[in-house]
From Swiss-Prot:
InterPro entries, per the entry: Rrt14 (IPR031404)
Family: Belongs to the RRT14 family.
Function of the molecule: Involved in ribosome biogenesis, probably through modulation of rDNA transcription.
Keywords on record: Nucleus, Transcription, Transcription regulation
Annotated region described as Disordered, given as residue ranges: 28-67, 215-240
Native source species: Lodderomyces elongisporus (strain ATCC 11503 / CBS 2605 / JCM 1781 / NBRC 1676 / NRRL YB-4239)
Pfam families xrefs: RRT14
Record's protein name: Regulator of rDNA transcription 14
Major localization listed first in the record, in broad terms: nucleus
Amino acid sequence: MASFTSNASKHQAELTVNRMFADILHTQPLRSAKSTTSNKSKSASKFGNDRKALSMPTPLSSTQILSQQLQPQLQQTRLSLKTGKSSQNNNKVKKLLKKKHEQDKKFQKFIKYSMIKNKMSTDPESLTLEEHKYLKKLAKRNINALQKYSKIDDFEIEQEMSSVKNELLKDLAPKKQTRLRKKLAIPAKKGSARSNANNQINDFDYERKLQKGLISAPGLTPGLAPVDYDDDEEEEEEED
């Protein structure tokens, strides 16, 4: 065998021979097998080192520990603030939409009522059955609203109002009677037609009662002539 000048040339020759035999036998060269096994071992060792590095926990500082403890609370407060603001905004939007809907509804009713009112003033016979029903319903609703506002819900106030009403009626009733009595009790003026008629009636009653003997004249005894009565005067009157 030929001598090799160096180990490198010897190794190169061995590789060449191995490749030739590998081509003939269709096998992998020894160098490649050794290299693959070495590569596998290196990769396995590297993977193991990486796993060890990952599995070993790194020590945390006090600031990191405190931040980890406070992190859930901070997230919860942020979430609550967001939800609170969003709920407030939603409520405001809902109120605005509801108000706008009510205003639109009132405006539509006003337009409808104005059209029907105009039709009633110009041509009432042109009103349809639905419009007549609408007017009846509107009138009934307004009457109920007035009755509701005029009614007193408080029982004490209603009772007090009824008592005041009764007192006023009692005060008014005697005044009317006293006025009539005063009118009847006031004597008529002298010289008036009423006074003359009253005097004639009184004189007639007096004479009638005197003739029947129900009353007596002043200075007379029942059944006797007056004290100053003179028979001669009566005879003279008869002779005349």
